[in-house]
């Protein structure tokens, strides 16, 4: 692919992601259609399908982007404090509240669930023995359901208050 075509490809993908994000602010994920994305993005359906299989594929791509952003935040933080790392994650989630609220109730939730293992693997539980694996899964699921509840309630607790709940 030549440079100009590659730039056009990336530009189309950005437009699709932007339109999708705007539509998420306006309506439920299940009501967003490929046709609507294409019309709002001023692209052909074939262009959409060159990038994504369906609407959930767009959401999945957004998850990949958010997961990379979160990993970047972890790499940039030279903190070994579990509490500080959790604070950074919670702030990132709150800054991207709409995306996470939608994602927690979508088919990509299993990807999100596995993506959050970074929170627990990099700290005191390494998951090397069977008991530790159960402990890690318990903590991860409790963490995710608490985050889901927080998102469903419009992040009505401050990050610090939620951190106190999670870190007890």
Locate predicted features:
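Amphipathic alpha-helical packing segments from all-alpha helical-bundle domains
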Residues: 105-145, 168
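Short, hydrophobic secondary-structure boundary micro-motifs
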Residues: 32-33, 101-103, 112, 159
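Cytosolic nucleotide-binding catalytic cores of signal-transduction proteins
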Residues: 24-27, 40, 122-127, 131-134, ...
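Hydrophobic alpha-helical connector segments
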Residues: 74-101
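C-terminal peripheral helix-coil segments that are non-catalytic and often amphipathic
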Residues: 149-168
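N-terminal intrinsically disordered/low-complexity leader segments
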Residues: 1-9
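An amphipathic alpha-helix adjacent to DNA-recognition modules
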Residues: 10-21, 25, 30-34, 39-42, ...
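Generic structural signal for secondary-structure transition and capping sites
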Residues: 29, 95-98, 125
